[in-house]
Amino acid sequence: MMSSKGNEVHGMRKIILRIAGSAVMAAAILCGAQVSCAQRVGPDTIALFPKNIGEFAYANLKQARAEKWFPQLQEQMLPERFKQFEKFLASAGVDPNSQVEELAWGLIAEGVTAKTEGTGSTAVPTGEEIVGVALGNYNPNSTEAYFKAQKLPSFKSHGFTMYAFGTGTGPSDLFFLFLDSNTAAFGHRSELEQMLDVRYGGAEGLLRNERMYSLINEANGSGVVWAVLNPAYTRLAMQQLAPQVQQFPEAAKLVTRMQNLILNIQASSGIDGKFQAICGSVDDANTLAQLMTLAFAYQQYQAKQQNPDLANLLGQATVNPAGDRVVLRLALTDDQMTTLIKKNTFALKM
């Protein structure tokens, strides 16, 4: 019978695999990009987002599309709602592949409160809404004229017209509007309206969320792809990836004390995917690092038979505690990426 310690490691290995998958999927689109090309998201863009964002992410799609095998990964890694957004724009004559250059989006959790979303709680999101901006070059007048001619459902807010992806009445329907010729916003209606409230000073924005904004500033500009998660989304990630971990009191307590997750990708002649788990203490970080190291070794052993290329990748991963953080790094070559993509290694549902 497996000991509780062994079960903890078994549960943690699933977390590590998902972490590895997340980092690799993001890293995969960046081979050939240069570190010097990594762009910072301007504070004016970050300032558009509501204060209660639980997850904030960024991708430089212009650089990603320069990679020859990006189309193969696009179906696996891009958010489903962004795919809907691309199709929606294409119907109006907008070419997302040439006109949409950067994407930033945020998730707003349902099922948690301002009190329960922080550390020390077991509450996790039970649903979510999305709001995002696509930065690029647009012709708002011609696009909006097309939407009007098609008689798409629309709503006015703060002088802007929001166009519905679907009927405009469903709870999951997404909307779209142009903020200017370089910025298109998309998301659920309530969140878009909140974004406009923030824009015009009627509500507090993400700049007022000191913890998230501090970590966003840390991640911003350090990679072509990066993301920051708050405590509630951190717990949800752990719960979804390794439900067994909640069965063990000490491991479960460690999860409730976790503060944030940060992912960023740097690229030069190769790829360096960096994932940081911010723990509740130095001791927690040391414990988590030990479990992650064991989990990688175990998964590497399991993968040798079915996917030796993945096993090699896991063998190259490094896990180290750094104060109250655990830092995971994954380094990949072009050849490794090509082989792993062919084997559909990155087909993970995020």
Segments (PLM) and residue ranges:
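A conserved glycine-rich beta-strand in the N-terminal activation segment of trypsin-fold
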Residues: 172-237
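N-terminal secretory signal peptides that target proteins for export/translocation
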Residues: 1-17
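Gly/Pro-enriched, hydrophobic low-complexity segments
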Residues: 202-205, 265-306
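One face of beta-strands
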Residues: 57, 132, 259-263, 269-277, ...
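A short, solvent-exposed beta-edge/loop patch
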Residues: 57, 170-200, 270, 318-337
